[in-house]
From Swiss-Prot:
Coiled coil region boundaries: none
Keyword set, alphabetical order: Chloroplast, Plastid, Ribonucleoprotein, Ribosomal protein, RNA-binding, rRNA-binding
Major localization listed first in the record, in broad terms: plastid
UniProt keyword RNA-binding, yes or no: yes
Single GO biological process annotation from the record: translation
Record function comment: Binds to 23S rRNA.
Protein name (record): Large ribosomal subunit protein uL23cz/uL23cy
Quaternary structure, from the entry: Part of the 50S ribosomal subunit.
Xref: PROSITE patterns: RIBOSOMAL_L23
Gene3D superfamilies from the UniProt entry: 3.30.70.330
Record-stated family: Belongs to the universal ribosomal protein uL23 family.
Keyword Nuclease attached: no
Lineage start: Eukaryota, Viridiplantae, Streptophyta, Embryophyta, Tracheophyta
Residue pairs linked by disulfide bridges in the UniProt entry: none
Length: 93
């Protein structure tokens, strides 16, 4: 499934990690139930709630045609207490 693009690490998302909330960018065509099912299946966790919002589109001009570059939205996934998503990469020594 190509629903989740990548995890987001901003000041806000790092602060939300303490509340057991994980932030990631997902494709705009994916639904909440698809993302919830995929996260529960792939990571083996229970999702408590999901919030999503679209980021403001950035314009890009190619000659005379104006287009947009943002084709995703941001999901904040709250897990039930006792569950956590392991880090995707281990630190190399």
């Amino acid at each position: 499934m190509n629903g989740i693009k990548y995890a987001v690490f901003t000041d806000k998302s790092i602060r939300l990690l303490g509340k057991n909330q994980y932030t990631s960018n997902v494709e705009s065509g994916s639904t909440r139930t698809e993302i919830k099912h995929w996260v529960e299946l792939f990571f083996g966790v229970k999702v408590k709630a999901m919030n999503s919002h679209r980021l403001p589109a950035k314009g890009r001009k190619v000659r005379l045609i104006m287009g947009h570059t943002m084709h995703y939205r941001r999901m904040i996934i709250t897990l039930q207490p006792g569950y956590s998503i392991p880090p995707l990469r281990k630190k190399r020594t």
